Amino acid sequence: KYISPINEPNGEWSQNPNQEGSFATKADIYKVVYELDKAITNASIPTKIIIPEIGNMKYLFEADSIPKMPDNLIEDLFTRQGEYCVTKFKNLYQCIAAHDYWTTYPPKLLVEMRTKIRNAIKNIPLIKFWASEYCILEQNEEITMPPSPTRSINLGLYVARIIHHDLTIANASAW
């Protein structure tokens, strides 16, 4: 039903052969969606395209020091003012997909980032937000401790807090 052709376009994947991802500029993302939309239409396949599957939610808004790094993706891909607006493609599922990595701690950052997402998409007609990938990669005092039943409970509560905030603050329609 869905296809996600680009994974974590903000990552410089040539530096780590043990990870998968597909670095892509906003122009690359637009071209992929354009070509895939055309192919899906021509083949009459009942499939929707999901993008951008960004690996860090900050790139939905912020710029980075790397010039080609895709940033400000909500405005540039999902609003009519955006140079690479993809909302016109009929096979695009109208959602912004993002991964939760590196935006979960401290709790203040968790809340701030999800509030930014909610505020950014509330005035874009029909656009939803999906929290589309997460596993614990961070190391912080809430979850870093020797293996024990307490650690297992803390890890579960940590992930539950992320899910809760994605659903209730960012209004994620999928997790």
Language-model features: where?
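Mobile, glycine-rich extracellular loop/lid and propeptide segments
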Residues: 1-8, 12-15
